[in-house]
């Protein structure tokens, strides 16, 4: 067991495609487990879990040129590692498309954000990433109560917006707009929440 999973940090190591990023696991002094599944995918498990624990995914970098959320995620992970930020919920951090980030572009061949449904698409780098991420998400949520699952997909606006910070709650086949989630959003002093009631990309 090593003292640290990363040469520099989760973000820097995930983006350094010239270096391997082998899977590994460490437990820090307070009992929190850090489990690196693969490049860009890190699970954080608190020392204590029960039936009330949430299972939260924080994904970013689905659009490779939206880098601010990646820095935010990296800071959260560093704060958890140092013990500054206590963690009571099971977490999965995802940096989705390191190759696109390194290319300073939104995507390479196809918009990754449009590939997470069950339709058939032509084979692209992004389709392979989407299929892998869907498997990772399914594995993370396996045997967990549906009402304890949150997925926060972090983006940053590339155009001027009326609201500096906002949440988009997409239309889904499953109930995802829980009171607890909305209270969490409110606690973050987000400017606005947009409830999308029609399919969107």
Protein language model features and the residues they cover:
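Structured catalytic-domain cores with a bias toward divalent-metal coordination
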Residues: 1-201
């Amino acid at each position: 067991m090593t003292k640290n999973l990363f040469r520099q940090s989760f973000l820097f190591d995930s983006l350094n495609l010239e270096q391997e990023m082998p899977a590994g696991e460490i437990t820090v002094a307070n009992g929190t487990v850090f489990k690196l599944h693969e490049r860009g995918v890190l699970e954080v498990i608190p020392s204590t879990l029960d039936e009330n624990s949430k299972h939260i995914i924080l994904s970013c970098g689905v659009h490779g040129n939206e880098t601010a959320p990646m820095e935010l995620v990296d800071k959260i992970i560093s704060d958890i590692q140092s013990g500054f930020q206590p963690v009571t919920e099971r977490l999965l951090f995802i940096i989705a498309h390191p190759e696109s980030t390194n290319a300073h572009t939104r995507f390479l061949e196809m918009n990754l954000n449009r590939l997470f449904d069950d339709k058939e698409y032509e084979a692209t780098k992004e389709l392979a990433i989407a299929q892998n991420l869907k498997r990772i998400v399914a594995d993370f949520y396996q045997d967990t109560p549906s009402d304890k699952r949150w997925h926060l997909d972090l983006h940053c606006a590339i155009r001027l917006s009326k609201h500096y910070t906002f949440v988009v709650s997409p239309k889904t086949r499953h109930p995802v707009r829980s009171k607890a989630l909305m209270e969490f959003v409110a606690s973050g002093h987000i400017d606005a929440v947009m409830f999308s009631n029609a399919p969107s990309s």
